[in-house]
Amino acid sequence: MSSKEQKTPEGQAPEEIIMDQHEEIEAVEPEASAEQVDPRDEKIANLEAQLAEAQTRERDGILRVKAEMENLRRRTELDIEKAHKFALEKFINELLPVIDSLDRALEVADKANPDMSAMVEGIELTLKSMLDVVRKFGVEVISETNVPLDPNVHQAIAMVESDDVAPGNVLGIMQKGYTLNGRTIRAAMVTVAKAK
């Protein structure tokens, strides 16, 4: 009897036994590997999670810094624009009493007197020149009457009964007001009409 023909006590050839054992080992190995978790895999997963979290924090930080820089740039531009726009405010405030004095001089001047006509004309020209210059720099005079009272540009001093002007409208100007580029630098002192 040759070795190939020899049977094992169970009646199987040795090659069959080896094949059966090999299949059993293969069947057992996946279960064993599923149960065994390599500690390095856990560490890698943990490090990957930490890396993703750090990248998210870094990305958020970069976005926050960019937003802060953009806001700072905008605020700086606005501050510079306001500084240019309203740099003359202090100077204009110093000129207002001079303009008021020229206005009062014209109000009290005797325009009917021929001897005073040259002086009145000089005051008028000086006032006109000064107002033209300040207008070039964004100054506007608040002196309209018969317009609704605006607390942003008018300061009511008195209320006077009137049939000619609607109630709540400006009846008269006691002192002119001025704005610089839309900002009130001095409110006009006015009398306001009220119903009889």
Curated annotation (Swiss-Prot):
What are the entry keywords? Answer: Chaperone, Cytoplasm, Stress response
Q: Which PROSITE patterns match?
A: GRPE (PS01071)
Matching Pfam families: GrpE
The subcellular location is: Cytoplasm
Query: Which InterPro entries would you find in this protein's record?
Result: GrpE, GrpE_coiled_coil, GrpE_head
Q: Note the SS bond partners.
A: none
Q: In which broad location class does this protein mainly occur, judging by the first location in its UniProt entry?
A: cytoplasm
Q: Would you say which domain of life the source belongs to?
A: Bacteria
Molecular function as annotated in GO: adenyl-nucleotide exchange factor activity; protein homodimerization activity; protein-folding chaperone binding; unfolded protein binding
Disordered: annotated segments = 1-39
Q: Which GO terms describe its biological process?
A: protein folding
**GO-annotated cellular components:** cytosol
Known function:
Participates actively in the response to hyperosmotic and heat shock by preventing the aggregation of stress-denatured proteins, in association with DnaK and GrpE. It is the nucleotide exchange factor for DnaK and may function as a thermosensor. Unfolded proteins bind initially to DnaJ; upon interaction with the DnaJ-bound protein, DnaK hydrolyzes its bound ATP, resulting in the formation of a stable complex. GrpE releases ADP from DnaK; ATP binding to DnaK triggers the release of the substrate protein, thus completing the reaction cycle.
Summarize subunit and interaction data from the UniProt record for this chain: Homodimer.
Sorted alphabetically, which NCBIfam families does this protein's record hold? PRK10325.1, PRK14140.1, PRK14150.1
- HAMAP family for the chain: GrpE
Indicate the family of this protein: Belongs to the GrpE family.
Protein name, UniProt field: Protein GrpE
Gene label? grpE
